[in-house]
Each structure stands twice: as structure tokens, then as C-alpha cells.
Amino acid sequence: MARFTARTNADEPPITELQLATLVTEAPEGIEWLHEQKFDGYRILAELDRGKVRLLSRRFKDWTSEFPAVAEAVSKLSAESAVLDGEVAAVMPDGRTSFQALQNARSGARLSYFVFDLLEMDGEAVMKLALEERKARLEQLVRKSPGVIRYSDHVLGSGREFFQLACKQGLEGIISKRRDKPYLPGRGPTWVKTKCMLRQELVIGGYTDPEGSRTGIGALLVGYYEGSELRYAGKVGTGFSHALLEELRALLVPLECAASAFSPEPPRAWTGSGRHWVTPTLVGEVAFAEWTNDGRLRHPSFQGLRKDKRAIDVVRETPEQAGTSGTSAKPKPTKQKPAKPRATRR
């Protein structure tokens, strides 16, 4: 039985990198794939060690104090030690998860920790096992846990039909995973994601003054890194609450600088007048319809700040064509009918 690697320093994260999904244009088919709902929240790695709990962000920052209810629930699991991978998200009354609601304590949404993988349990390196076995053990571990921890269920095969159903229900998209593979840190072909609407993180490089009755800011000027150069991606002027407009202004004014960080500097015809450049340290998530031919966002809408992402890591996401991300060129047929996408099973 493989054992989990010992660490010389207790403050070190239990693994060097999380497994990440590659964006694709089409969900894979075939019984070798299982499909899960894509949650709209913060990726969190939960580490349990003899009753003590540590919650780590995607970049392994200690976020235990951010989600005390999650930490308490993890501490009550029936294991001496465990490492769980999942996503903390706010669940709306209609069952969908909302990143905006997660950032707004007054949204009325309830907080849940959706767990979809088990990396270690009682000293055993479960991450070396096939995903299907890991999920079976995970479900056993959390089935009697407090309601804040929720098991992320899945369906087998029929990925495209499952994706279409997810989009009809207003979900962000789906994650498809090879059921026979171990947990492989980094971004690779055994986990792929298909999105109903394009969304990605973008760096805030400036803002414009508000007009009319609007307060705070008018719009955000955003971009992404291409090598060491920050490329302009567009102007985001929708998706803000009044409180968020004021919060953004308070964050951006201290970051103002004389020169644009964008290369090349966008013309005023693209940004509008009354623009202010800022040091590009803040990252936001933006939903949009498509990329235009000149590399700008079409119909963008702001979704929220991403304090779990570094600006320098933000690049333009380009989906791979089906068949180039570990998907089979000739999908294997499956007799199993797709289940409706459920948020979770307790």
C-alpha cells in the first residue's frame, strides 16, 4: 500500500500542485470518462490531521479563517488524517452556484464545500489510485458528514448530452475526467472542462470615471499576459452592484500610476475618456460572449474579484479541439443514459 509522502515542514502543502482541467471545445464521449458539474467558487484543498484542519487555496495560501464552517465540518470526518480536493461555493435557492453570491454575505445563499477528490486518507496515498476508486472512498468518508460538505456526484459517458443539459439548467459548464487515471498534478489531458459561456480571469490595468448617476467607477480596463507583455482585452462596464463599484474604486485609486501597463497602449477610441491607469495587481473574473477578431471581449460582464489568482499567471484561455486533449477521435459508445446534472449528493 502506497504511503503519503512525509513533509519536513508542517507548513508545507501536502502536494506541490493541484490537478487542473484543460479547456476544450467539446465534451468527450466514451465510457472511460465521467462527468461532473463545474462549480462557480473557490478551489480549496482541505487537510485533516488528528482533528486539526487547514484549508488551502489554489496557490496554497492558508484560507482556514475564511471558511470556519467548512473547517469545522472537515474536523468531524471519521478519519485520523485526510486530504480532500473540492470547491467552496455559494448555493442559490434554485440550486445553482454563484461566484458573485460567494463574495456577498447578504445574498441569502448558503455556503457548501463540494468535494470531488480524495488524495490521502489515514496515511495512504489514495491519489495513486484510479479516480473511480478515489471517489468511492470519498463518498464513504463524507456520506455522514455535516451538511456543509457535499459529495460531487457524476455520470458516466454521454458527455455532450450531459453538457447540453447542464447549459439548459443555467450551470457554468462541466468537468470531464478519465475514470481510470490517478491524480496527476498540473494541467493535462485527463481532466478537461467545457464551458456553457466563455469566462476567464483577466488582469485589471485601469478604470474609467463614472458617468451620469453612476458612482465609484465607470468601467474596468482589463487584459491578459502574453509572455511578459500585458495585452489589452477590453472594457467591462456591466455586472457591478453599487457596493462593488465603491469597493473597486477604493481598491484602484491607491494603485493609480502615470503610464499604461498595457502593451501596446489601447487607443482612447477603445477605452473612452476619463481613463486611469493602475498597477496591474488585481484579477477579476469576466463572462463574455466571444473574442472579436481584433482580440477584444464581446459583451463582457464582471463576475467578481479573484483573490486566489496572481496577475502574472493570467493568460488568454484558448480551447483545444476535441481529440487533442486526451479525448478519443472515435468515441466509444455507451448504453448508459445521462443523468440530470445534480449539484450534489449528501
What residue spans do the PLM features occupy?
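Catalytic cores of nucleic-acid ligases and guanylyltransferases
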Residues: M1-R346
